[in-house]
């Protein structure tokens, strides 16, 4: 075998012994592998029931099924649910009738064994039966049933401002810790304000392009003939600068809290003035949509108004007239009815329901608690809310602590802190007793160790240079340490901002009311003996480090291939590999979330903007159906290995998100999005410590295509054939391939990123964002249906790439890769002293095997494909993969 240093590096024939004995065809499943056959794993709206055909991992499980109802103004549906030990349902263990939600949450754990369940829409035939099993490995969920929570809410007021039973103690506490003084200072700003006559965004809902709101000043707050509460986030010519709902909410809430903490009626009467003006606003705009065309309850103002009025109704009863009380009660009743109609069949059905979980849910809960006893329907609302939380929390995760939305988790912190505290107030149960919350600190740690930037898979808004967690995330970690005694959470919180939550008087109000701590009393020490790599299979991210707790010596390699697909705040980056070196970005995505239509559609959100692969110049669809997953992961002291499968990530039915995004950009979807040409894309990533990263790609298409192997760098790249070097950093990439590839390095994106919003940067609104770094595209010089790629990334100490004895040597490491696409893929790695070795596929079982000698003892770890938990309810096939 020879390598050619002309315009490319090339491995032209097979260089690996020890390969699988039988070549894989397009139809056969290679040994040890699993093939997921489902169109989607985390659908936009549920398309399959669960649980079906497997042992559940939590007891009792939540039972969920598809619902045809997809809009909040459509009539509510009613469902029946039955559970039995037999498929004939002659004996029923559980029978529930008349539920508006398309799910069932049981009240107690089930006995071990096989169970059958079914559901129906009232008046229609039963769907099912569906079977599942319960065994001793299932986690027991001991949360009290919803009726315990609902019945514990008494008629005593106030309830959400501060429980009357805690009033005196809370007043003393807040006076001592400075909360009262801070709130009173804030509340003073709301006095003597000329209140707007309307919400401009409701008045001109859905008509922002007509710019009528630009000339209309009736939505402004004014004081002493000057506008007050002006947006500091957006310039006045951008429509989001007109959002005033947060001011209405904070005005009423802060004034109510100041009233109860001080007993001074002036705060209460001012809060009532604000609330009564707000109660004159229409509950829904004329077209039932937000200014940008979403269903109105999806917008933040709807939840803010609900919470403001709930606080007023709860805390100002003694100051109201009967007429005012009736007006507020009727207003709240209608708002709660609308939200309940909006939530039903949505919260339980959507894999990604951002705004509800981020913002409106704790506000709905506040209002429903406030209205219990005064509104008969409130009990139903509270029961639904409690049960859907039990069924779906955490919304964008499962048990491993990973969060699909990346650093967008900050938008969920209020919900994660307030809702469990309110439940605990009435039940006494700690709702953080869930594997997700115990594992969440490790996700934060591995994706962004203190002193380092994040892994680049942050969802919307990646690329910030912050080396610390946001204050509210640090505060959440402090709460988790307080409630679960998690030193790693407390340590992470302290690294960002000690007492982060305590510095914000409005943070964790429900916990403060109960006298619950915001942090653990003991100071946490740095965690010890942590593995240098961690897999988060629920969200499809692996993080591999050289020196986890020492950023200046760290090399961080991350791969993403997510079962959630490309939806919500995440991007078309399946099988992308990112590299962070010494705490700084090296090989990471590019683009700007707010870079205007063309850049957002074709660069930032697109696979083109990520370190993955293009097929005929096209990338992964913007759809939940375009998903990936991580079948394999192994970790040792010298070698860590992960495999991402993005075979399904390049095909999906047309999705409305694509229409929106490419429509705004005035670009043709067909020019940028692939539809089904990809047949197989398995990416194998090995981190050979201390400084070598190996990427081995298996690529198969249904026809001859041009392949583009994409790599973005925050520094300048220089190409010499298929060798890339990084200016100013000891880093290089040698790309070997089964078909010749030519490298192109660009310094400008396909479309410039324009600062069209001017967010936090008013002066540069409308100007291009600066171009940062460079972008390499290694493209096949001829179309081919199959391609193998072997990339050797050296970061730090550099070694020559040497062809020897049918393999490749790089420093102390020897690699042998099967580069003939007609043969089964395989890869072996060994180091010079014989202390570490890896084989991708054994001939008999197709196992990946990692062998290391540590302290004179040989350690061997093995794996075949392992199905992710989220895929257990869908169709898949296996050739001895682990189910």
Regions found by a protein language model. Give the residues of each.
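Aromatic-lined, polymer-binding surfaces characteristic
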Residues: 239-449, 460
